[in-house]
A protein has these predicted regions:
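Short, well-ordered alpha-helices that flank and scaffold nucleotide-derived cofactor binding pockets
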Residues: 15, 19, 42, 105-108
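N-terminal Rossmann NAD(P)H-binding glycine-rich loop of SDR-like oxidoreductase domains
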Residues: 1-27
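A short helix-coil junction within the Rossmann-fold of NAD(P)-dependent oxidoreductases
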Residues: 84-85, 106-113
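NAD(P)H-binding glycine-rich loop region in Rossmannoid oxidoreductase-like domains
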Residues: 31-35, 41-98
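SDR active-site strand-loop-helix element
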Residues: 3, 27, 74-78, 116-120
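Hydrophobic/aromatic anchor residues within beta-strands of the central parallel beta-sheet
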Residues: 53, 114-116
Length: 120
């Protein structure tokens, strides 16, 4: 699974994994938003590979648990993106910490995840 798959880093990771014929669960904030999914759906998939786009809210622990369920590896690139804020702690730092904690808690609650890669 790649969190933040619609972002710059996440989408490049997804493209690389698909080019190697891997199955990828790609999480996005809004699966109905063409800006978030069209570029992912247009990626080349090598033989044996598969792309599954899943909507996930980092701040909703149940959403994160559903997305992690059944995955062997998690590459966590998702983050709350706010370009400018006078309340950076509240709008950027706290949500990023909670989101990462939700990912880690979801991984801890399952026996299937064997590998975690976290970017920051």
């Amino acid at each position: 699974m790649v969190t933040g798959a619609s972002g710059y880093i996440g989408s490049h990771i997804v493209a690389n994994l698909l080019s190697k014929g891997m199955s990828v669960r790609a999480t996005v904030r809004d699966s109905s938003d063409p800006e978030r999914v069209d570029h992912l759906e247009s990626l080349s998939v090598s033989d044996g590979g598969h792309l599954e786009i899943v909507e996930m809210d980092l701040l909703d622990s149940e959403s994160v648990h559903r997305a992690v369920s059944g995955c062997e590896s998690v590459i966590h690139t998702a983050a709350v993106v706010v370009l400018k804020s006078k309340r950076a702690q509240e709008k950027i730092v706290d949500p990023s910490v909670v989101g990462t904690r939700n990912v880690l808690d979801a991984i801890d609650s399952t026996d299937c995840v064997k590998c975690l890669v976290h970017t920051s």
